[in-house]
Every structure is written in C-alpha cells, then in structure tokens.
Amino acid sequence: KEFFDVSWLLGVAFEDDCRAVVTDDLDGDGRVDLLVTEYKTRGDWDAFRLKVLRNNFESDNHWIGVRLRDTAEGGSAIGARVTVEAGDRPLVGRIVTGDSFTAQHASVMHFGLGERERVESLTVEWADGRSVTIDGPEIDRYHNLATDAGH
C-alpha cells in the first residue's frame, strides 16, 4: 500500500512552517477539527497565526467520546487511560499533554466506531489506579467524567 499526499485537496497544505497541531471537536458535533499554528519569519520579527480547520465532512459513522475534568479532590486527568469495548477489539487512548510541539490537548478522547451502533462499555482508569466503567454507554455523544468519579 502507498500513501499519497492529498493535503492540498483538503486545504491543509501550508507553505509556511506549522509547528503546533491540536485536534479537538470544537463544536461537539462528533467530527474532529484541527488547530494549527503557522510560524513565519519576516526579517527581524517572528509571527504566529492560529488556523482553525473545521471538519464539515458529512458522515453516517458513529462515535463516542469522553471529556475528563480535573477536580481538587481527584487530581489530574493527565495519564488517564480510556478503553472502549466495541466489538472484536478494544479501542484504547491515553490522556497526555505535550505530544505536539508548543501545544497542549484538552482532556478529551474521541473514538470513531464506524458502522457499529453499540458499545459494550467505556472504562476510565485514572493515573492513581482508580477506575470507573459505564456499561452500555450511549453513542454519538460525549460522556463527562470528573477525576473524583470512581471513589
């Protein structure tokens, strides 16, 4: 299999240096958007410009997401492991920070489910070892959990 660069077809081929990339579903519609900072040097000064690329592609595919919120009692969402049991293999993600140069992602996980219309469970394992599981969670929406969930 080969990969082809089609970024110019989608309007994401930038001529200048783009140093930070963050993905997030900015409008909560289940389609992940892209934020990019463009860096330009103009003589003796530097300029940064934020570009927001909204995902407006229509899709009948399903998804599920989780938004993790820090609490004073529960600590940080950073390091949490999120597992979605949906069919023959688990979908797993970890909340991290700093995985893109000069950028930080929100404490949000988004999982594409394709044509699957059901999820068996969604589990969050916090960095301190606590966990919380939602059995049969609703799809095509975000589930909000605080770090003190699972006490």
Per-region residue spans from a language model:
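Gly/Ser/Thr/Pro-enriched helix-cap/hinge segments flanking short amphipathic alpha-helices
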Residues: 2, 8-17, 31-151
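Signature of short aromatic-glycine-proline-rich micro-motifs recurring in repeat-based ectodomains
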Residues: 18-22
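Acidic, divalent-cation-chelating loop motifs in proteins
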Residues: 23-29
